């Protein structure tokens, strides 16, 4: 694979509307060349015998079964609350906005 040129980097910078100095053109050309070589190397991997997967680990169901269990009654849940009304926790108002009914 041919190395990316300074002119190509300058063109990409113009398209991206990036201000790039002459020194940065050389640096970016080298860095982009390394990245493109790595991408090309990944593309060379033969994966025809590997089945497509959605996960790298072959687990099918790692969640527990849903089980109905007993829970607190409204009275038990509200028993430690400083204030309650209509089976709900009552808290101080924090906004001074009028509530439209």
Swiss-Prot record:
Its EC number is 6.3.5.-. It catalyses: L-glutamyl-tRNA(Gln) + L-glutamine + ATP + H2O = L-glutaminyl-tRNA(Gln) + L-glutamate + ADP + phosphate + H(+); L-aspartyl-tRNA(Asn) + L-glutamine + ATP + H2O = L-asparaginyl-tRNA(Asn) + L-glutamate + ADP + phosphate + 2 H(+). The keyword Protein biosynthesis applies. InterPro entries: Asp/Glu-ADT_sf_sub_c, GatC. Keywords: ATP-binding, Ligase, Nucleotide-binding, Protein biosynthesis. It comes from the Bacteria. One of its GO terms (molecular function) is asparaginyl-tRNA synthase (glutamine-hydrolyzing) activity. One of its GO terms (biological process) is glutaminyl-tRNAGln biosynthesis via transamidation. Heterotrimer of A, B and C subunits. Belongs to the GatC family. Allows the formation of correctly charged Asn-tRNA(Asn) or Gln-tRNA(Gln) through the transamidation of misacylated Asp-tRNA(Asn) or Glu-tRNA(Gln) in organisms which lack either or both of asparaginyl-tRNA or glutaminyl-tRNA synthetases. The reaction takes place in the presence of glutamine and ATP through an activated phospho-Asp-tRNA(Asn) or phospho-Glu-tRNA(Gln). PANTHER family: GLUTAMYL-TRNA(GLN) AMIDOTRANSFERASE SUBUNIT C, MITOCHONDRIAL. This is Aspartyl/glutamyl-tRNA(Asn/Gln) amidotransferase subunit C. It comes from Salinispora tropica (strain ATCC BAA-916 / DSM 44818 / JCM 13857 / NBRC 105044 / CNB-440). The gene is gatC.
């Amino acid at each position: 694979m041919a190395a990316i040129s300074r002119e190509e980097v300058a063109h990409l910078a113009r398209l991206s509307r990036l201000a790039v100095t002459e020194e940065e053109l050389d640096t970016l050309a080298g860095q982009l060349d390394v990245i493109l070589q790595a991408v090309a190397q990944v593309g060379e991997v033969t994966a025809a015998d590997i089945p497509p997967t959605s996960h790298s680990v072959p687990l099918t169901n790692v969640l527990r079964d849903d089980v109905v269990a007993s829970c607190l009654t409204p009275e038990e849940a509200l028993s430690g609350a400083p204030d309650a009304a209509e089976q709900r926790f009552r808290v101080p108002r924090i906004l001074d906005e009028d509530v439209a009914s």
